[in-house]
Amino acid sequence: MSGLNSIGLGLVGDIGGTNARFALVDFDGADPQLIEPTSYKGEDYGTAEDAIEHYLAKMGLKHPDQAVVAVAGPIEHGAVHFTNSDWKLSEDSLRRAGGFRTARLINDFTAQALAAPRLAPKDLRQIGPLQTSGEGDLAILGPGTGFGAAGMVRRHGVETPLTTEGGHIAFAPFDDTEIEILRVLIKRFGRCSIERLLSGPGMEDLHVILGEIEGRKVDELTAKQITEHAVAGDDCCKVTIERFCAILGSAAGDLALALGARGGVFIAGGIAPRIVDLLEEGEFRARFEAKGRLSDYTRAIPTHVVMNPHTALIGAAVAMTPDGRAAIS
Protein backbone atom coordinates (compact mmCIF):
# COMPACT_ATOMS: atom_id res chain seq x y z
CA MET A 1 0.00 0.00 0.00
CA SER A 2 1.62 3.24 -1.10
CA GLY A 3 1.66 6.55 0.71
CA LEU A 4 2.43 5.24 4.20
CA ASN A 5 5.29 6.62 6.21
CA SER A 6 6.63 4.54 9.07
CA ILE A 7 7.09 7.65 11.23
CA GLY A 8 4.29 7.75 13.79
CA LEU A 9 2.86 4.40 12.74
CA GLY A 10 2.70 1.28 14.87
CA LEU A 11 1.69 -2.31 14.28
CA VAL A 12 -0.95 -4.02 16.40
CA GLY A 13 -1.75 -7.71 16.30
CA ASP A 14 -4.20 -10.20 17.75
CA ILE A 15 -2.96 -13.78 17.47
CA GLY A 16 -5.09 -16.66 18.72
CA GLY A 17 -5.33 -20.36 18.14
CA THR A 18 -6.95 -20.01 14.70
CA ASN A 19 -6.54 -16.49 13.32
CA ALA A 20 -3.86 -13.80 13.24
CA ARG A 21 -5.16 -10.25 12.82
CA PHE A 22 -3.04 -7.18 12.19
CA ALA A 23 -3.50 -3.47 11.60
CA LEU A 24 -1.41 -0.35 11.48
CA VAL A 25 -2.11 2.42 13.98
CA ASP A 26 -2.00 6.14 13.28
CA PHE A 27 -1.55 8.42 16.30
CA ASP A 28 -2.15 11.73 14.52
CA GLY A 29 -5.59 12.25 16.09
CA ALA A 30 -6.84 12.28 19.67
CA ASP A 31 -7.46 8.52 19.58
CA PRO A 32 -5.41 5.87 17.76
CA GLN A 33 -6.96 4.89 14.43
CA LEU A 34 -6.71 1.41 12.88
CA ILE A 35 -5.50 1.29 9.27
CA GLU A 36 -6.16 -1.75 7.04
CA PRO A 37 -7.13 -4.36 9.65
CA THR A 38 -6.51 -7.76 8.04
CA SER A 39 -7.13 -11.33 9.19
CA TYR A 40 -5.08 -14.40 8.24
CA LYS A 41 -5.51 -18.09 8.99
CA GLY A 42 -2.71 -19.20 11.28
CA GLU A 43 -2.43 -22.56 9.52
CA ASP A 44 -1.23 -20.75 6.38
CA TYR A 45 2.01 -19.65 8.08
CA GLY A 46 4.82 -21.58 9.68
CA THR A 47 5.39 -19.05 12.46
CA ALA A 48 3.83 -15.93 13.92
CA GLU A 49 6.82 -13.96 12.63
CA ASP A 50 6.07 -15.17 9.08
CA ALA A 51 2.53 -13.80 9.31
CA ILE A 52 3.77 -10.45 10.65
CA GLU A 53 6.38 -10.12 7.90
CA HIS A 54 3.74 -10.98 5.27
CA TYR A 55 1.41 -8.25 6.53
CA LEU A 56 4.15 -5.59 6.62
CA ALA A 57 5.24 -6.55 3.09
CA LYS A 58 1.63 -6.33 1.90
CA MET A 59 1.39 -2.84 3.38
CA GLY A 60 4.72 -1.83 1.80
CA LEU A 61 5.99 -0.63 5.15
CA LYS A 62 9.46 -1.06 6.59
CA HIS A 63 10.42 -0.59 10.22
CA PRO A 64 7.33 0.87 11.91
CA ASP A 65 8.21 2.54 15.18
CA GLN A 66 6.53 0.15 17.61
CA ALA A 67 4.42 -2.99 17.91
CA VAL A 68 1.98 -4.36 20.46
CA VAL A 69 0.65 -7.86 19.81
CA ALA A 70 -2.15 -9.45 21.82
CA VAL A 71 -1.60 -13.19 22.25
CA ALA A 72 -3.71 -16.12 23.46
CA GLY A 73 -1.69 -17.57 26.29
CA PRO A 74 0.24 -16.68 29.43
CA ILE A 75 3.28 -14.45 28.84
CA GLU A 76 6.41 -15.28 30.79
CA HIS A 77 9.65 -13.30 30.52
CA GLY A 78 8.43 -11.57 27.37
CA ALA A 79 7.52 -14.77 25.53
CA VAL A 80 4.45 -16.91 24.90
CA HIS A 81 3.84 -20.49 23.82
CA PHE A 82 0.29 -20.30 22.49
CA THR A 83 -2.16 -22.38 24.50
CA ASN A 84 -4.08 -23.73 21.50
CA SER A 85 -1.45 -23.80 18.76
CA ASP A 86 2.19 -24.82 18.27
CA TRP A 87 3.35 -21.26 17.67
CA LYS A 88 5.78 -19.43 19.95
CA LEU A 89 6.54 -15.72 19.96
CA SER A 90 8.81 -13.47 22.01
CA GLU A 91 9.20 -9.73 22.20
CA ASP A 92 12.76 -10.12 20.89
CA SER A 93 11.71 -12.19 17.86
CA LEU A 94 8.82 -9.78 17.20
CA ARG A 95 11.20 -6.82 17.29
CA ARG A 96 13.56 -8.51 14.84
CA ALA A 97 10.79 -9.64 12.48
CA GLY A 98 9.44 -6.14 11.93
CA GLY A 99 12.47 -4.00 12.66
CA PHE A 100 10.55 -2.25 15.43
CA ARG A 101 12.19 0.11 17.91
CA THR A 102 9.98 -1.32 20.67
CA ALA A 103 7.80 -4.44 20.75
CA ARG A 104 5.50 -5.73 23.45
CA LEU A 105 3.26 -8.76 23.98
CA ILE A 106 0.07 -8.51 26.02
CA ASN A 107 -2.59 -11.09 26.79
CA ASP A 108 -5.42 -11.09 24.24
CA PHE A 109 -8.11 -10.56 26.86
CA THR A 110 -6.08 -7.82 28.52
CA ALA A 111 -6.37 -6.13 25.14
CA GLN A 112 -10.12 -6.81 25.13
CA ALA A 113 -10.32 -5.22 28.59
CA LEU A 114 -8.46 -2.09 27.45
CA ALA A 115 -10.88 -1.74 24.55
CA ALA A 116 -14.14 -2.48 26.39
CA PRO A 117 -14.76 0.98 27.93
CA ARG A 118 -14.13 2.58 24.52
CA LEU A 119 -16.59 0.51 22.49
CA ALA A 120 -19.46 2.31 20.79
CA PRO A 121 -23.08 1.12 21.05
CA LYS A 122 -22.82 -0.23 17.48
CA ASP A 123 -20.03 -2.56 18.66
CA LEU A 124 -22.25 -4.25 21.27
CA ARG A 125 -25.41 -6.35 21.49
CA GLN A 126 -27.24 -6.05 24.79
CA ILE A 127 -28.30 -9.35 26.39
CA GLY A 128 -30.88 -8.81 29.09
CA PRO A 129 -32.62 -5.67 30.36
CA LEU A 130 -29.65 -3.57 31.52
CA GLN A 131 -27.25 -1.18 29.80
CA THR A 132 -23.74 -0.36 31.01
CA SER A 133 -23.60 2.78 33.14
CA GLY A 134 -19.97 3.73 32.58
CA GLU A 135 -19.20 3.02 36.22
CA GLY A 136 -17.96 -0.02 38.13
CA ASP A 137 -15.47 -2.76 37.39
CA LEU A 138 -15.83 -4.93 34.28
CA ALA A 139 -15.35 -8.56 33.28
CA ILE A 140 -14.44 -9.45 29.71
CA LEU A 141 -14.60 -13.10 28.74
CA GLY A 142 -15.51 -15.41 25.95
CA PRO A 143 -15.10 -18.56 23.88
CA GLY A 144 -13.10 -18.94 20.70
CA THR A 145 -10.45 -21.54 19.98
CA GLY A 146 -9.99 -21.37 23.76
CA PHE A 147 -11.67 -19.37 26.52
CA GLY A 148 -10.26 -16.05 27.68
CA ALA A 149 -11.08 -13.84 30.63
CA ALA A 150 -9.88 -10.54 32.08
CA GLY A 151 -11.04 -7.79 34.38
CA MET A 152 -10.99 -4.01 34.25
CA VAL A 153 -10.68 -2.19 37.58
CA ARG A 154 -11.93 1.40 37.44
CA ARG A 155 -11.05 3.71 40.34
CA HIS A 156 -11.17 7.52 40.42
CA GLY A 157 -10.93 7.82 36.66
CA VAL A 158 -8.04 5.36 36.35
CA GLU A 159 -8.53 2.11 34.40
CA THR A 160 -6.34 -0.88 35.22
CA PRO A 161 -6.75 -4.19 33.34
CA LEU A 162 -6.48 -7.41 35.31
CA THR A 163 -4.86 -10.23 33.35
CA THR A 164 -6.16 -13.70 34.24
CA GLU A 165 -6.24 -17.29 33.02
CA GLY A 166 -9.89 -17.57 34.04
CA GLY A 167 -10.69 -19.96 31.21
CA HIS A 168 -8.94 -22.68 33.18
CA ILE A 169 -11.08 -22.52 36.32
CA ALA A 170 -13.05 -25.69 37.00
CA PHE A 171 -16.39 -26.38 35.32
CA ALA A 172 -19.24 -26.38 37.85
CA PRO A 173 -22.28 -28.40 36.66
CA PHE A 174 -25.72 -26.90 37.22
CA ASP A 175 -28.03 -29.90 36.75
CA ASP A 176 -28.05 -33.68 36.28
CA THR A 177 -27.23 -33.46 32.56
CA GLU A 178 -24.17 -31.34 33.27
CA ILE A 179 -23.08 -33.75 36.01
CA GLU A 180 -23.10 -36.49 33.36
CA ILE A 181 -21.15 -34.23 30.98
CA LEU A 182 -18.58 -33.63 33.71
CA ARG A 183 -18.23 -37.38 34.38
CA VAL A 184 -17.43 -38.01 30.71
CA LEU A 185 -14.86 -35.21 30.57
CA ILE A 186 -13.18 -36.17 33.85
CA LYS A 187 -12.66 -39.68 32.48
CA ARG A 188 -11.09 -38.16 29.38
CA PHE A 189 -9.00 -35.34 30.86
CA GLY A 190 -8.75 -36.00 34.60
CA ARG A 191 -9.84 -32.41 35.25
CA CYS A 192 -12.44 -30.33 33.44
CA SER A 193 -11.97 -26.59 33.03
CA ILE A 194 -14.63 -24.35 31.51
CA GLU A 195 -12.46 -24.12 28.38
CA ARG A 196 -13.04 -27.86 27.83
CA LEU A 197 -16.66 -26.95 27.02
CA LEU A 198 -16.70 -23.23 26.26
CA SER A 199 -14.54 -23.19 23.14
CA GLY A 200 -14.72 -24.40 19.57
CA PRO A 201 -13.27 -27.84 20.41
CA GLY A 202 -15.40 -27.90 23.56
CA MET A 203 -18.57 -27.30 21.57
CA GLU A 204 -17.69 -30.23 19.31
CA ASP A 205 -17.19 -32.51 22.33
CA LEU A 206 -20.39 -31.23 23.93
CA HIS A 207 -22.36 -32.07 20.78
CA VAL A 208 -21.21 -35.70 20.82
CA ILE A 209 -21.56 -36.12 24.61
CA LEU A 210 -25.13 -34.79 24.63
CA GLY A 211 -26.03 -37.31 21.94
CA GLU A 212 -24.54 -40.13 24.03
CA ILE A 213 -26.37 -39.01 27.18
CA GLU A 214 -29.69 -38.71 25.37
CA GLY A 215 -29.24 -41.98 23.46
CA ARG A 216 -29.27 -40.47 19.99
CA LYS A 217 -26.68 -40.77 17.25
CA VAL A 218 -25.14 -37.49 16.17
CA ASP A 219 -22.76 -36.65 13.36
CA GLU A 220 -19.34 -35.36 14.37
CA LEU A 221 -19.42 -31.74 13.22
CA THR A 222 -17.08 -28.80 13.51
CA ALA A 223 -18.02 -25.92 15.80
CA LYS A 224 -18.68 -23.79 12.72
CA GLN A 225 -21.07 -26.41 11.33
CA ILE A 226 -22.85 -26.80 14.68
CA THR A 227 -23.45 -23.06 15.00
CA GLU A 228 -24.54 -22.69 11.37
CA HIS A 229 -26.95 -25.64 11.61
CA ALA A 230 -28.36 -24.39 14.92
CA VAL A 231 -28.97 -20.90 13.54
CA ALA A 232 -30.66 -22.53 10.51
CA GLY A 233 -33.02 -24.40 12.86
CA ASP A 234 -31.50 -27.90 13.08
CA ASP A 235 -33.00 -29.38 16.27
CA CYS A 236 -30.01 -31.52 17.23
CA CYS A 237 -27.49 -28.70 16.86
CA LYS A 238 -29.84 -26.27 18.54
CA VAL A 239 -29.88 -28.49 21.64
CA THR A 240 -26.09 -28.29 21.73
CA ILE A 241 -26.00 -24.51 21.34
CA GLU A 242 -28.74 -24.02 23.93
CA ARG A 243 -26.71 -26.03 26.43
CA PHE A 244 -23.53 -24.17 25.41
CA CYS A 245 -25.27 -20.82 26.01
CA ALA A 246 -26.56 -21.98 29.40
CA ILE A 247 -23.10 -23.12 30.54
CA LEU A 248 -21.63 -19.85 29.26
CA GLY A 249 -24.19 -17.96 31.35
CA SER A 250 -23.19 -19.84 34.49
CA ALA A 251 -19.48 -19.30 33.86
CA ALA A 252 -19.97 -15.61 33.08
CA GLY A 253 -21.92 -15.15 36.30
CA ASP A 254 -19.23 -16.94 38.30
CA LEU A 255 -16.51 -14.74 36.81
CA ALA A 256 -18.61 -11.62 37.43
CA LEU A 257 -18.75 -12.59 41.10
CA ALA A 258 -15.03 -13.39 41.25
CA LEU A 259 -14.03 -10.11 39.60
CA GLY A 260 -16.65 -7.92 41.27
CA ALA A 261 -17.80 -6.82 37.81
CA ARG A 262 -20.75 -4.67 38.83
CA GLY A 263 -20.15 -2.34 35.88
CA GLY A 264 -20.85 -5.01 33.29
CA VAL A 265 -19.79 -8.23 31.60
CA PHE A 266 -18.66 -8.25 27.97
CA ILE A 267 -18.80 -11.55 26.04
CA ALA A 268 -16.04 -11.42 23.43
CA GLY A 269 -14.33 -14.00 21.23
CA GLY A 270 -15.20 -15.50 17.88
CA ILE A 271 -18.20 -17.67 18.80
CA ALA A 272 -20.63 -15.39 20.66
CA PRO A 273 -21.39 -13.00 17.76
CA ARG A 274 -22.39 -15.97 15.58
CA ILE A 275 -24.94 -17.25 18.12
CA VAL A 276 -26.04 -13.92 19.58
CA ASP A 277 -29.75 -14.48 18.83
CA LEU A 278 -29.67 -17.84 20.62
CA LEU A 279 -27.82 -16.26 23.54
CA GLU A 280 -30.59 -13.70 23.80
CA GLU A 281 -33.42 -16.22 23.44
CA GLY A 282 -32.00 -19.00 25.61
CA GLU A 283 -30.98 -19.53 29.21
CA PHE A 284 -27.79 -17.47 29.17
CA ARG A 285 -29.17 -14.59 31.19
CA ALA A 286 -31.18 -16.80 33.58
CA ARG A 287 -28.11 -18.90 34.34
CA PHE A 288 -25.98 -15.76 34.67
CA GLU A 289 -28.33 -14.50 37.38
CA ALA A 290 -28.89 -17.86 39.15
CA LYS A 291 -26.33 -17.46 41.94
CA GLY A 292 -28.34 -18.45 45.01
CA ARG A 293 -27.92 -15.91 47.79
CA LEU A 294 -26.04 -13.59 45.41
CA SER A 295 -28.69 -13.63 42.66
CA ASP A 296 -29.69 -10.03 43.40
CA TYR A 297 -26.03 -9.07 42.86
CA THR A 298 -25.75 -10.68 39.43
CA ARG A 299 -29.27 -9.59 38.43
CA ALA A 300 -28.04 -5.99 38.58
CA ILE A 301 -25.06 -6.58 36.23
CA PRO A 302 -25.44 -5.70 32.52
CA THR A 303 -24.29 -8.23 29.91
CA HIS A 304 -23.30 -7.47 26.32
CA VAL A 305 -21.88 -9.42 23.38
CA VAL A 306 -18.97 -7.72 21.61
CA MET A 307 -19.79 -7.70 17.90
CA ASN A 308 -16.69 -5.84 16.64
CA PRO A 309 -14.09 -8.41 15.44
CA HIS A 310 -11.23 -5.93 15.88
CA THR A 311 -11.66 -5.22 19.59
CA ALA A 312 -8.33 -6.79 20.62
CA LEU A 313 -6.58 -4.67 17.97
CA ILE A 314 -8.21 -1.58 19.47
CA GLY A 315 -7.00 -2.66 22.91
CA ALA A 316 -3.48 -3.25 21.61
CA ALA A 317 -3.54 0.27 20.16
CA VAL A 318 -4.65 1.65 23.53
CA ALA A 319 -1.65 -0.14 25.07
CA MET A 320 0.60 2.03 22.90
CA THR A 321 -0.72 5.27 24.41
CA PRO A 322 0.89 6.76 27.53
CA ASP A 323 -2.15 5.90 29.67
CA GLY A 324 -2.28 2.37 28.26
CA ARG A 325 1.41 1.76 28.85
CA ALA A 326 1.05 2.96 32.43
CA ALA A 327 -1.99 0.72 32.99
CA ILE A 328 -0.17 -2.48 32.01
CA SER A 329 3.31 -1.63 33.28
Curated annotation (Swiss-Prot):
It is found in: Cytoplasm. InterPro entries: ATPase_NBD, Bacterial_glucokinase, Glucokinase. It is an enzyme of class 2 (transferase). Transmembrane segments: none annotated. Its EC number is 2.7.1.2. Pfam families: Glucokinase (PF02685). GO terms for biological process: glycolytic process. The keyword Ribonucleoprotein does not apply. One of its GO terms (cellular component) is cytosol. Its main location: cytoplasm. Keywords: ATP-binding, Cytoplasm, Glycolysis, Kinase, Nucleotide-binding, Transferase. It catalyses: D-glucose + ATP = D-glucose 6-phosphate + ADP + H(+). ATP binds at residues 13-18. One of its GO terms (molecular function) is D-glucose binding. The keyword Electron transport does not apply. Belongs to the bacterial glucokinase family. NCBIfam families: glk. PANTHER family: GLUCOKINASE. This is Glucokinase. It comes from Caulobacter sp. (strain K31). The gene is glk.
